[in-house]
Amino acid sequence: MISGDSIVALSSGRLPAGVAVLRISGPQTRFVVETIAGGMVKDRVAVLRRFKAPDGTVLDSGLVIFFPGPASFTGEDVAEFHVHGGRAVVARMLEIISGFDGVRHAEPGEFTRRAFLNGKVDLVETEALADLVNAETEAQRRFAVRNAEGVQSELYLSWRRRLIHARAMIEAEIDFADEDDVPGSVSDTVWSDVRAMIGEIDRHIAGFHAAEIIREGFEVVILGAPNAGKSSLFNALARRDAAIVTDEPGTTRDLLEVTLDLGGLRVRLTDTAGLREAPGKVEAIGIEKARAKADRADLLLLLEDILAPGVLGPLPGKAPLLRVGTKLDLLDEGSAREAAGRYDVAISVVGGTGVEALLAEIGRRAADAAGDVGDVLPSRLRHVELLGEANRHLLRAAAEDAAGQELRAEELRLAADSLGRIVGAIDVEDMLDVIFSQFCIGK
């Protein structure tokens, strides 16, 4: 358990607020509670107290809860003061608490860092807590909660346990090659399991893009010729005038982005400059940005004016294409039905026709790309990198023409170490500052 300084911070949201929660963790916690709350309180019970400074000055009235270590979030003694959420109240409470000997203001993520160092959470669970705090959609929340409960960590630890067992079997075969206690078929069983694990890890790595879509968003880029109605559609989907709409071609020269929540999934929609030949110098820069953005898209919306269909030439990007006919309101009913058949979706932003159908189709494609939010997926690039590293060691170990059993066993050890670094079981000190800097002060 960590010893030394105690830390304090505001753990609740932005001030002013109805209630603010101040959290303290460390060896001085009990003394701070006794002093400010006028005596110790029962463990894990919210008690109403008048809070006073050491000189007797009344600071506020509120609830105090004490969580004795190691059965607390950080593994240390922890207390929470629930006070009125005014800026002056919180500032004075923090000033008084941090004024105690051995108590200081917490750094970003320091409470969670102490929880990790005290074995209360592993690194994957820590990252999931950061995702949960930052979750904006239902899919992000569900994904983060599942990983925070240890499902992802357990998968990596189960692979690691299998490798440790495999290595033990191989080393036993090496050490007792002349004994009858070790069956000759042990190595065959071990390498069969290792090859199966290689496939399992490969399939798991393949799910990273789905995890990216859940965490970062499904990228949708609007493309089309100038005046095809891109900015009008963008504004309609954003439900505000985010883009300038005029009859003059080439009005949009920079990328405009808005975030939507479709069926609980985050969807990032980008409006781009109209694609055309021989644009002006500034407009050409916008078109180049549009092409670069399209290269990173998950879905391209190709908009075309139904009254003036044209040929744009080769389109940027390799993402699936959704052809959208615009300005449907300018046609009579019969012509509109005929024209709509040429597109995946035909819309009229002015009348609202087809816009909800387009949103539904985008949402369906986003859901297909994200897959089942309950699937166990690698949630960080570092997971993918370490999983790939583990598999490279396993491939070398499992190769038919591999060197002696000793070297193959060493490759198994290195693979297990790579998996261990994902959850923080070994050698992760260099990653801690990066990971915990993602948290707010009070977490």
Swiss-Prot record:
Function: Exhibits a very high intrinsic GTPase hydrolysis rate. Involved in the addition of a carboxymethylaminomethyl (cmnm) group at the wobble position (U34) of certain tRNAs, forming tRNA-cmnm(5)s(2)U34.
Keyword Cytoplasm belongs to the record: yes
Transmembrane segments: none
Keyword DNA repair: no
Binding site for Mg(2+): S231, T252
Recorded GO MF terms: GTP binding; GTPase activity; metal ion binding
Protein name according to UniProt: tRNA modification GTPase MnmE
Originating species: Mesorhizobium japonicum (strain LMG 29417 / CECT 9101 / MAFF 303099)
Coarse class of the protein's main subcellular location: cytoplasm
